[in-house]
Protein backbone atom coordinates (compact mmCIF):
# COMPACT_ATOMS: atom_id res chain seq x y z
CA UNK A 1 0.00 0.00 0.00
CA UNK A 2 2.88 2.30 0.82
CA UNK A 3 4.38 1.68 -2.60
CA UNK A 4 1.08 2.64 -4.26
CA UNK A 5 0.90 5.85 -2.23
CA UNK A 6 4.50 6.63 -3.11
CA UNK A 7 3.80 6.25 -6.84
CA UNK A 8 0.63 8.32 -6.50
CA UNK A 9 2.42 11.14 -4.69
CA UNK A 10 5.34 11.03 -7.11
CA UNK A 11 3.07 11.09 -10.15
CA UNK A 12 1.01 13.95 -8.75
CA UNK A 13 4.18 15.91 -8.02
CA UNK A 14 5.50 15.45 -11.56
CA UNK A 15 2.13 16.44 -13.02
CA UNK A 16 2.08 19.54 -10.85
CA UNK A 17 5.60 20.53 -11.92
CA UNK A 18 4.63 20.01 -15.58
CA UNK A 19 1.51 22.19 -15.13
CA UNK A 20 3.55 24.95 -13.49
CA UNK A 21 6.11 24.88 -16.31
CA UNK A 22 3.41 24.93 -19.01
CA UNK A 23 1.14 27.56 -17.50
CA UNK A 24 3.73 29.90 -16.02
CA UNK A 25 6.49 29.78 -18.62
CA UNK A 26 6.69 33.02 -20.61
CA UNK A 27 5.10 32.86 -24.03
CA UNK A 28 7.84 33.68 -26.59
CA UNK A 29 5.13 35.06 -28.93
CA UNK A 30 3.46 37.27 -26.31
CA UNK A 31 4.87 40.43 -27.89
CA UNK A 32 2.70 39.93 -30.99
CA UNK A 33 -1.01 40.91 -31.12
CA UNK A 34 -3.40 37.96 -30.70
CA UNK A 35 -6.20 38.46 -33.22
CA UNK A 36 -8.65 35.66 -32.39
CA UNK A 37 -7.77 34.55 -28.89
CA UNK A 38 -10.27 33.07 -26.44
CA UNK A 39 -13.07 35.43 -25.48
CA UNK A 40 -14.37 35.82 -21.90
CA UNK A 41 -16.07 32.61 -20.82
CA UNK A 42 -14.28 30.45 -23.42
CA UNK A 43 -12.15 27.77 -21.75
CA UNK A 44 -10.67 26.25 -24.90
CA UNK A 45 -9.78 27.49 -28.39
CA UNK A 46 -12.74 25.75 -30.06
CA UNK A 47 -14.62 28.97 -30.86
CA UNK A 48 -11.39 30.66 -31.96
CA UNK A 49 -10.86 27.86 -34.47
CA UNK A 50 -14.42 28.22 -35.76
CA UNK A 51 -13.91 31.97 -36.18
CA UNK A 52 -10.74 31.25 -38.16
CA UNK A 53 -12.46 28.72 -40.43
CA UNK A 54 -15.35 31.08 -41.22
CA UNK A 55 -13.73 34.53 -40.99
CA UNK A 56 -10.05 34.11 -41.91
CA UNK A 57 -10.02 36.95 -44.43
CA UNK A 58 -11.47 39.48 -42.00
CA UNK A 59 -9.07 38.27 -39.29
CA UNK A 60 -6.12 38.80 -41.63
CA UNK A 61 -7.38 42.27 -42.44
CA UNK A 62 -7.71 43.02 -38.73
CA UNK A 63 -4.17 41.79 -38.12
CA UNK A 64 -2.76 44.00 -40.88
CA UNK A 65 -4.57 46.99 -39.42
CA UNK A 66 -2.98 46.44 -35.99
CA UNK A 67 0.63 45.85 -36.96
CA UNK A 68 3.00 45.98 -39.90
CA UNK A 69 5.25 43.24 -38.49
CA UNK A 70 3.53 40.08 -37.24
CA UNK A 71 0.50 38.86 -35.35
CA UNK A 72 -0.78 35.61 -33.82
CA UNK A 73 -3.72 33.69 -35.20
CA UNK A 74 -5.45 30.55 -33.93
CA UNK A 75 -5.99 28.26 -36.92
CA UNK A 76 -7.71 24.89 -37.07
CA UNK A 77 -4.28 23.28 -36.58
CA UNK A 78 -2.29 25.47 -34.21
CA UNK A 79 -1.38 28.99 -33.13
CA UNK A 80 0.36 30.56 -36.11
CA UNK A 81 2.62 33.58 -36.39
CA UNK A 82 1.49 35.54 -39.45
CA UNK A 83 4.20 37.77 -40.91
CA UNK A 84 3.76 40.83 -43.08
CA UNK A 85 4.68 40.25 -46.72
CA UNK A 86 7.55 42.74 -46.43
CA UNK A 87 9.65 39.91 -44.92
CA UNK A 88 9.42 37.65 -47.97
CA UNK A 89 12.74 38.62 -49.51
CA UNK A 90 14.49 38.23 -46.17
CA UNK A 91 13.10 34.73 -45.59
CA UNK A 92 12.89 33.45 -49.17
CA UNK A 93 16.05 31.33 -48.94
CA UNK A 94 16.50 31.08 -45.17
CA UNK A 95 18.16 27.73 -44.44
CA UNK A 96 16.51 27.37 -41.03
CA UNK A 97 12.97 27.22 -42.38
CA UNK A 98 11.54 23.72 -42.88
CA UNK A 99 8.63 23.28 -45.30
CA UNK A 100 8.39 19.48 -45.06
CA UNK A 101 7.51 19.23 -41.36
CA UNK A 102 4.20 21.21 -41.43
CA UNK A 103 2.41 18.90 -43.92
CA UNK A 104 3.53 15.84 -41.97
CA UNK A 105 2.28 17.38 -38.72
CA UNK A 106 -0.96 18.68 -40.21
CA UNK A 107 -1.82 15.40 -41.92
CA UNK A 108 -0.52 12.92 -39.35
CA UNK A 109 2.08 11.34 -41.59
CA UNK A 110 3.06 8.89 -38.86
CA UNK A 111 -0.38 7.20 -38.96
CA UNK A 112 -1.19 4.33 -41.32
CA UNK A 113 -3.23 5.62 -44.25
CA UNK A 114 -1.45 8.99 -44.16
CA UNK A 115 1.96 7.69 -45.29
CA UNK A 116 2.05 9.86 -48.46
CA UNK A 117 2.45 12.83 -46.08
CA UNK A 118 5.38 11.19 -44.25
CA UNK A 119 8.51 12.91 -45.51
CA UNK A 120 10.78 10.10 -44.29
CA UNK A 121 8.90 7.38 -46.19
CA UNK A 122 8.33 9.46 -49.32
CA UNK A 123 11.87 10.92 -49.32
CA UNK A 124 11.23 14.45 -50.65
CA UNK A 125 14.86 14.77 -51.77
CA UNK A 126 14.29 12.07 -54.37
CA UNK A 127 11.03 13.75 -55.39
CA UNK A 128 12.64 17.20 -55.69
CA UNK A 129 15.62 15.84 -57.62
CA UNK A 130 13.30 14.04 -60.04
CA UNK A 131 11.27 17.18 -60.71
CA UNK A 132 14.34 19.40 -61.03
CA UNK A 133 16.63 17.16 -63.09
CA UNK A 134 14.17 15.01 -65.05
CA UNK A 135 10.64 16.42 -65.32
CA UNK A 136 11.39 20.11 -65.86
CA UNK A 137 14.12 19.53 -68.51
CA UNK A 138 11.66 17.25 -70.35
CA UNK A 139 8.94 19.91 -70.69
CA UNK A 140 9.61 20.19 -74.42
CA UNK A 141 8.95 16.47 -74.87
CA UNK A 142 5.65 16.18 -73.00
CA UNK A 143 3.59 18.46 -75.26
CA UNK A 144 2.37 15.87 -77.77
CA UNK A 145 1.43 13.14 -75.24
CA UNK A 146 -0.38 15.74 -73.11
CA UNK A 147 -2.20 17.02 -76.18
CA UNK A 148 -3.20 13.50 -77.23
CA UNK A 149 -4.56 12.73 -73.77
CA UNK A 150 -6.43 16.05 -73.57
CA UNK A 151 -8.14 15.27 -76.86
CA UNK A 152 -9.17 11.84 -75.54
CA UNK A 153 -10.44 13.08 -72.16
CA UNK A 154 -12.42 16.05 -73.51
CA UNK A 155 -14.18 13.84 -76.02
CA UNK A 156 -15.24 11.59 -73.15
CA UNK A 157 -16.13 14.32 -70.66
CA UNK A 158 -17.59 17.06 -72.88
CA UNK A 159 -18.64 14.94 -75.90
CA UNK A 160 -18.77 16.13 -79.52
CA UNK A 161 -22.33 17.43 -79.27
CA UNK A 162 -22.88 20.76 -81.01
CA UNK A 163 -25.91 21.40 -78.78
CA UNK A 164 -25.52 23.33 -75.55
CA UNK A 165 -25.21 20.98 -72.58
CA UNK A 166 -24.14 21.43 -68.98
CA UNK A 167 -21.00 20.20 -67.25
CA UNK A 168 -19.72 20.45 -63.70
CA UNK A 169 -16.51 22.44 -64.09
CA UNK A 170 -14.73 21.12 -61.00
CA UNK A 171 -15.44 17.46 -61.76
CA UNK A 172 -14.36 17.87 -65.38
CA UNK A 173 -11.17 19.69 -64.36
CA UNK A 174 -10.27 16.98 -61.84
CA UNK A 175 -10.71 14.22 -64.41
CA UNK A 176 -8.68 16.13 -66.99
CA UNK A 177 -5.78 17.06 -64.72
CA UNK A 178 -5.62 13.62 -63.09
CA UNK A 179 -5.45 11.90 -66.47
CA UNK A 180 -2.90 14.33 -67.90
CA UNK A 181 -0.65 14.07 -64.85
CA UNK A 182 -0.89 10.27 -64.83
CA UNK A 183 -0.01 10.17 -68.54
CA UNK A 184 3.38 11.70 -67.76
CA UNK A 185 3.84 10.24 -64.27
CA UNK A 186 2.97 6.61 -65.10
CA UNK A 187 2.42 6.25 -68.84
CA UNK A 188 -0.50 5.72 -71.24
CA UNK A 189 -1.81 2.48 -69.72
CA UNK A 190 -2.11 3.60 -66.10
CA UNK A 191 -3.55 7.03 -66.97
CA UNK A 192 -6.65 5.28 -68.33
CA UNK A 193 -7.00 2.95 -65.36
CA UNK A 194 -10.18 4.07 -63.55
CA UNK A 195 -8.94 2.65 -60.24
CA UNK A 196 -5.76 4.75 -60.29
CA UNK A 197 -7.53 7.92 -61.42
CA UNK A 198 -10.07 7.39 -58.64
CA UNK A 199 -7.27 7.21 -56.09
CA UNK A 200 -5.61 10.35 -57.49
CA UNK A 201 -8.83 12.32 -57.17
CA UNK A 202 -10.39 10.84 -54.03
CA UNK A 203 -7.44 10.15 -51.73
CA UNK A 204 -6.54 13.81 -51.23
CA UNK A 205 -10.15 14.82 -50.49
CA UNK A 206 -10.59 11.94 -48.05
CA UNK A 207 -7.26 12.70 -46.35
CA UNK A 208 -8.14 16.38 -45.85
CA UNK A 209 -11.59 15.59 -44.45
CA UNK A 210 -10.28 12.84 -42.18
CA UNK A 211 -7.49 15.07 -40.88
CA UNK A 212 -10.15 17.58 -39.81
CA UNK A 213 -11.94 14.86 -37.85
CA UNK A 214 -8.72 13.72 -36.19
CA UNK A 215 -7.93 17.26 -35.04
CA UNK A 216 -10.97 17.04 -32.76
CA UNK A 217 -9.19 14.36 -30.71
CA UNK A 218 -6.29 14.80 -28.27
CA UNK A 219 -3.07 14.14 -30.16
CA UNK A 220 -1.93 11.48 -27.70
CA UNK A 221 -5.05 9.41 -28.47
CA UNK A 222 -4.67 9.40 -32.26
CA UNK A 223 -2.57 6.23 -32.36
CA UNK A 224 -5.66 4.40 -31.06
CA UNK A 225 -8.52 6.44 -32.54
CA UNK A 226 -7.40 6.16 -36.16
CA UNK A 227 -7.87 2.38 -36.13
CA UNK A 228 -11.61 2.77 -35.59
CA UNK A 229 -12.61 5.75 -37.76
CA UNK A 230 -14.24 4.51 -41.02
CA UNK A 231 -12.56 7.26 -43.04
CA UNK A 232 -9.13 6.19 -41.75
CA UNK A 233 -9.91 2.62 -42.77
CA UNK A 234 -10.79 3.92 -46.24
CA UNK A 235 -7.47 5.76 -46.49
CA UNK A 236 -5.56 2.63 -45.52
CA UNK A 237 -7.49 0.71 -48.17
CA UNK A 238 -6.64 3.31 -50.83
CA UNK A 239 -2.95 3.18 -49.93
CA UNK A 240 -2.99 -0.61 -50.25
CA UNK A 241 -4.81 -0.42 -53.59
CA UNK A 242 -2.27 2.11 -54.83
CA UNK A 243 0.56 -0.18 -53.77
CA UNK A 244 -1.00 -2.99 -55.78
CA UNK A 245 -1.28 -0.88 -58.93
CA UNK A 246 2.27 0.48 -58.70
CA UNK A 247 3.60 -2.99 -57.89
CA UNK A 248 2.10 -4.29 -61.14
CA UNK A 249 3.70 -1.42 -63.05
CA UNK A 250 7.11 -2.18 -61.54
CA UNK A 251 6.79 -5.91 -62.23
CA UNK A 252 5.86 -5.24 -65.85
CA UNK A 253 8.81 -2.88 -66.22
CA UNK A 254 11.16 -5.52 -64.84
CA UNK A 255 9.83 -8.13 -67.26
CA UNK A 256 10.23 -5.72 -70.15
CA UNK A 257 13.82 -4.99 -69.20
CA UNK A 258 14.87 -8.63 -69.21
CA UNK A 259 14.16 -9.04 -72.90
CA UNK A 260 14.34 -5.44 -74.03
CA UNK A 261 16.68 -3.72 -76.39
CA UNK A 262 18.05 -0.31 -75.46
CA UNK A 263 15.53 1.25 -77.83
CA UNK A 264 12.59 -0.44 -76.10
CA UNK A 265 13.94 0.39 -72.65
CA UNK A 266 14.23 4.06 -73.59
CA UNK A 267 10.50 4.18 -74.25
CA UNK A 268 9.82 3.98 -70.49
CA UNK A 269 10.56 7.65 -69.91
CA UNK A 270 8.27 8.69 -67.10
CA UNK A 271 8.46 9.31 -63.37
CA UNK A 272 8.69 5.60 -62.53
CA UNK A 273 12.09 5.41 -64.22
CA UNK A 274 13.10 8.92 -63.23
CA UNK A 275 12.47 8.29 -59.52
CA UNK A 276 14.56 5.13 -59.67
CA UNK A 277 17.37 7.04 -61.36
CA UNK A 278 17.27 9.85 -58.80
CA UNK A 279 17.17 7.48 -55.82
CA UNK A 280 20.58 6.14 -56.92
CA UNK A 281 20.03 2.92 -55.05
CA UNK A 282 18.86 4.68 -51.88
CA UNK A 283 15.58 4.11 -50.06
CA UNK A 284 12.29 5.38 -51.43
CA UNK A 285 8.76 4.03 -51.62
CA UNK A 286 7.54 4.12 -55.27
CA UNK A 287 3.83 3.83 -54.40
CA UNK A 288 3.92 6.52 -51.72
CA UNK A 289 5.91 8.86 -53.94
CA UNK A 290 3.39 8.43 -56.76
CA UNK A 291 0.56 9.15 -54.31
CA UNK A 292 2.54 12.16 -53.08
CA UNK A 293 2.78 13.38 -56.67
CA UNK A 294 -0.99 13.02 -56.97
CA UNK A 295 -1.57 14.92 -53.72
CA UNK A 296 0.53 17.93 -54.78
CA UNK A 297 -0.40 17.95 -58.46
CA UNK A 298 -4.02 17.01 -59.00
CA UNK A 299 -6.25 19.21 -56.86
CA UNK A 300 -4.18 22.40 -56.97
CA UNK A 301 -3.92 22.36 -60.77
CA UNK A 302 -7.56 21.32 -61.20
CA UNK A 303 -8.63 24.13 -58.90
CA UNK A 304 -6.73 26.71 -60.95
CA UNK A 305 -8.10 25.28 -64.20
CA UNK A 306 -11.65 25.50 -62.82
CA UNK A 307 -11.11 29.09 -61.74
CA UNK A 308 -9.73 30.09 -65.15
CA UNK A 309 -12.76 28.56 -66.88
CA UNK A 310 -15.12 30.45 -64.58
CA UNK A 311 -13.18 33.70 -65.09
CA UNK A 312 -13.29 33.32 -68.87
CA UNK A 313 -17.03 32.68 -68.76
CA UNK A 314 -17.39 35.92 -66.78
CA UNK A 315 -15.09 37.76 -69.21
CA UNK A 316 -16.08 36.36 -72.63
CA UNK A 317 -14.34 39.26 -74.37
CA UNK A 318 -11.09 37.34 -73.75
CA UNK A 319 -12.15 34.21 -75.65
CA UNK A 320 -11.55 35.38 -79.22
CA UNK A 321 -8.14 37.00 -78.56
CA UNK A 322 -7.07 33.82 -76.79
CA UNK A 323 -8.21 31.64 -79.69
CA UNK A 324 -6.35 33.82 -82.16
CA UNK A 325 -3.18 33.58 -80.08
CA UNK A 326 -3.49 29.79 -79.80
CA UNK A 327 -3.93 29.34 -83.56
CA UNK A 328 -0.97 31.61 -84.37
CA UNK A 329 1.41 30.11 -81.83
CA UNK A 330 0.59 26.42 -82.32
CA UNK A 331 0.65 26.76 -86.12
CA UNK A 332 4.14 28.25 -85.89
CA UNK A 333 5.66 26.22 -83.05
CA UNK A 334 3.60 23.03 -82.65
CA UNK A 335 3.72 21.70 -79.07
CA UNK A 336 7.30 22.78 -78.49
CA UNK A 337 8.70 24.56 -75.45
CA UNK A 338 8.66 27.77 -77.52
CA UNK A 339 4.91 27.39 -78.02
CA UNK A 340 4.29 27.17 -74.28
CA UNK A 341 6.38 30.31 -73.73
CA UNK A 342 4.72 32.30 -76.53
CA UNK A 343 1.16 31.72 -75.30
CA UNK A 344 1.56 35.03 -73.52
CA UNK A 345 -2.07 36.14 -73.18
CA UNK A 346 -3.05 32.67 -71.95
CA UNK A 347 -0.18 32.85 -69.47
CA UNK A 348 -1.42 36.25 -68.26
CA UNK A 349 -4.97 34.95 -67.82
CA UNK A 350 -3.74 31.97 -65.79
CA UNK A 351 -1.56 34.14 -63.59
CA UNK A 352 -4.37 36.63 -62.99
CA UNK A 353 -6.77 33.86 -61.95
CA UNK A 354 -4.12 32.48 -59.62
CA UNK A 355 -3.42 35.95 -58.19
CA UNK A 356 -7.02 36.40 -57.10
CA UNK A 357 -7.15 32.96 -55.46
CA UNK A 358 -5.34 33.94 -53.08
CA UNK A 359 11.38 26.88 -37.83
CA UNK A 360 14.10 24.90 -36.33
CA UNK A 361 16.10 27.71 -34.61
CA UNK A 362 15.34 31.24 -33.42
CA UNK A 363 15.37 33.73 -36.29
CA UNK A 364 15.69 37.47 -35.77
CA UNK A 365 14.76 39.61 -38.75
CA UNK A 366 16.52 42.82 -39.73
CA UNK A 367 14.04 45.04 -37.87
CA UNK A 368 14.33 42.98 -34.67
CA UNK A 369 11.24 40.81 -35.21
CA UNK A 370 11.95 37.49 -33.48
CA UNK A 371 10.71 34.13 -34.74
CA UNK A 372 11.23 31.69 -31.83
CA UNK A 373 12.50 28.17 -32.44
CA UNK A 374 9.74 25.77 -33.50
CA UNK A 375 7.29 28.52 -34.51
CA UNK A 376 4.98 27.82 -37.44
CA UNK A 377 4.77 30.87 -39.69
CA UNK A 378 2.72 32.11 -42.62
CA UNK A 379 2.74 35.31 -44.66
CA UNK A 380 -0.13 37.44 -45.87
CA UNK A 381 -0.50 36.90 -49.62
CA UNK A 382 -3.85 38.48 -50.44
CA UNK A 383 -3.34 41.80 -52.20
CA UNK A 384 -6.99 42.72 -51.85
CA UNK A 385 -6.28 42.84 -48.08
CA UNK A 386 -2.80 44.36 -48.14
CA UNK A 387 -2.99 48.18 -48.36
CA UNK A 388 0.53 48.20 -49.82
CA UNK A 389 -0.43 46.04 -52.78
CA UNK A 390 1.73 46.58 -55.84
CA UNK A 391 -1.17 46.01 -58.25
CA UNK A 392 -3.39 48.76 -59.61
CA UNK A 393 -7.03 47.87 -58.93
CA UNK A 394 -5.76 44.66 -57.39
CA UNK A 395 -9.23 43.47 -56.39
CA UNK A 396 -10.44 43.47 -60.01
CA UNK A 397 -9.86 40.80 -62.66
CA UNK A 398 -7.73 41.91 -65.63
CA UNK A 399 -6.72 39.14 -68.02
CA UNK A 400 -4.25 41.47 -69.73
CA UNK A 401 -2.56 42.55 -66.47
CA UNK A 402 0.62 40.53 -66.82
CA UNK A 403 0.97 40.75 -70.58
CA UNK A 404 0.96 44.56 -70.20
CA UNK A 405 3.59 44.28 -67.48
CA UNK A 406 5.91 42.52 -69.95
CA UNK A 407 6.39 45.92 -71.60
CA UNK A 408 7.91 47.30 -68.38
CA UNK A 409 11.63 46.37 -68.60
CA UNK A 410 12.23 46.06 -64.86
CA UNK A 411 9.19 43.77 -64.43
CA UNK A 412 9.30 41.75 -67.66
CA UNK A 413 10.98 38.75 -66.00
CA UNK A 414 8.35 38.70 -63.23
CA UNK A 415 5.26 38.35 -65.39
CA UNK A 416 5.20 34.69 -66.42
CA UNK A 417 2.95 32.21 -64.65
CA UNK A 418 6.01 30.28 -63.44
CA UNK A 419 7.75 33.41 -62.09
CA UNK A 420 7.91 33.57 -58.30
CA UNK A 421 8.11 37.07 -56.87
CA UNK A 422 7.48 38.71 -53.53
CA UNK A 423 4.13 40.11 -54.70
CA UNK A 424 2.85 36.94 -56.41
CA UNK A 425 3.54 33.75 -54.49
CA UNK A 426 0.96 31.41 -55.97
CA UNK A 427 3.75 28.88 -56.51
CA UNK A 428 5.67 29.81 -53.36
CA UNK A 429 8.84 31.89 -53.18
CA UNK A 430 12.61 31.46 -53.05
CA UNK A 431 13.87 28.02 -52.03
CA UNK A 432 10.31 27.11 -51.07
CA UNK A 433 8.88 27.66 -54.57
CA UNK A 434 7.01 24.73 -56.10
CA UNK A 435 9.52 22.77 -58.24
CA UNK A 436 6.72 21.32 -60.38
CA UNK A 437 5.30 24.66 -61.51
CA UNK A 438 6.81 24.38 -65.01
CA UNK A 439 5.02 21.10 -65.63
CA UNK A 440 1.79 22.44 -64.13
CA UNK A 441 1.90 25.51 -66.38
CA UNK A 442 2.51 23.37 -69.47
CA UNK A 443 -0.28 20.96 -68.57
CA UNK A 444 -2.81 23.74 -67.95
CA UNK A 445 -1.95 25.66 -71.11
CA UNK A 446 -2.34 22.59 -73.31
CA UNK A 447 -5.65 21.71 -71.66
CA UNK A 448 -6.97 25.25 -72.18
CA UNK A 449 -5.81 25.36 -75.80
CA UNK A 450 -7.96 22.32 -76.57
CA UNK A 451 -10.89 23.53 -74.50
CA UNK A 452 -11.01 27.02 -76.01
CA UNK A 453 -10.57 25.99 -79.64
CA UNK A 454 -12.97 23.06 -79.48
CA UNK A 455 -15.79 24.38 -77.29
CA UNK A 456 -17.96 27.42 -76.76
CA UNK A 457 -18.46 28.22 -73.08
CA UNK A 458 -21.06 30.22 -71.22
CA UNK A 459 -22.32 30.67 -67.68
CA UNK A 460 -25.82 29.73 -66.67
CA UNK A 461 -28.01 31.66 -64.26
CA UNK A 462 -25.83 30.75 -61.27
CA UNK A 463 -22.67 32.80 -60.77
CA UNK A 464 -19.72 30.81 -59.38
CA UNK A 465 -18.73 31.59 -55.81
CA UNK A 466 -15.29 30.72 -54.48
CA UNK A 467 -15.41 28.72 -51.26
CA UNK A 468 -13.35 29.73 -48.25
CA UNK A 469 -12.21 27.52 -45.41
CA UNK A 470 -9.68 29.22 -43.18
CA UNK A 471 -6.81 30.29 -45.41
CA UNK A 472 -8.12 28.12 -48.23
CA UNK A 473 -9.86 29.65 -51.24
CA UNK A 474 -11.08 27.12 -53.79
CA UNK A 475 -13.11 27.36 -56.96
CA UNK A 476 -16.84 26.63 -56.85
CA UNK A 477 -17.35 22.83 -56.80
CA UNK A 478 -21.05 22.99 -57.64
CA UNK A 479 -21.69 25.57 -60.37
CA UNK A 480 -22.18 24.24 -63.88
CA UNK A 481 -21.52 25.92 -67.19
CA UNK A 482 -22.88 25.21 -70.67
CA UNK A 483 -20.61 23.98 -73.45
CA UNK A 484 -21.02 22.97 -77.07
CA UNK A 485 -18.61 21.65 -79.67
CA UNK A 486 -17.18 24.10 -82.17
CA UNK A 487 -14.95 23.46 -85.16
CA UNK A 488 -11.37 24.14 -84.21
CA UNK A 489 -9.29 26.19 -86.65
CA UNK A 490 -6.31 23.81 -86.55
CA UNK A 491 -5.68 20.20 -85.55
CA UNK A 492 -4.40 20.21 -81.99
CA UNK A 493 -3.57 16.57 -81.32
CA UNK A 494 -0.12 16.87 -82.87
CA UNK A 495 0.04 20.67 -83.12
CA UNK A 496 0.02 20.73 -86.93
CA UNK A 497 -2.20 22.97 -89.02
UniProtKB/Swiss-Prot annotation:
InterPro entries xrefs = Cyt_P450, Cyt_P450_CS, Cyt_P450_E_grp-IV, Cyt_P450_sf
State the compartments where it is located: Membrane
Pathway(s) the chain acts in: Secondary metabolite biosynthesis
Give the highest taxon in the source lineage. Answer: Eukaryota
**Where do glycans attach?**
98, 202, 362, 388
What's in the keyword line of the UniProt record? Glycoprotein, Heme, Iron, Membrane, Metal-binding, Monooxygenase, Oxidoreductase, Transmembrane, Transmembrane helix
Q: So where does heme get bound? A: 434
Ranges that cross the membrane:
4-24
Q: Using the UniProt record, name the top-level EC class of this enzyme in a single word.
A: oxidoreductase
Membrane topology, as annotated, equals: Single-pass membrane protein
Q: Which family does it belong to?
A: Belongs to the cytochrome P450 family.
What is the name of the protein in this document?
Cytochrome P450 monooxygenase PC-05
Amino acid sequence: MADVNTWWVGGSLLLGIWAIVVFFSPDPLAQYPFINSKRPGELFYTQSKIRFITQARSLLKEGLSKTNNAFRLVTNNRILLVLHSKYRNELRDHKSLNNTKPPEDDFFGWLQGFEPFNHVKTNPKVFAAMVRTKLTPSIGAVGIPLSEETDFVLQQQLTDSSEWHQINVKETSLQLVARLSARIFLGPQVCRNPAWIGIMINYTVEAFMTAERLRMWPRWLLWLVHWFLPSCKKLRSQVQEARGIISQVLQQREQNRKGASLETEASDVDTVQWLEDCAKGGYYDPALLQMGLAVVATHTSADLLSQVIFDLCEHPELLQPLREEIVTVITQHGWSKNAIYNLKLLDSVLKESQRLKPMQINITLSDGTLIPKGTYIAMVDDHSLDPNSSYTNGDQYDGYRFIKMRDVPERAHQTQLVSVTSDHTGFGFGNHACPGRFFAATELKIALCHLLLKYDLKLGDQKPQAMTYGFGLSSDPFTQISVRRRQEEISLADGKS
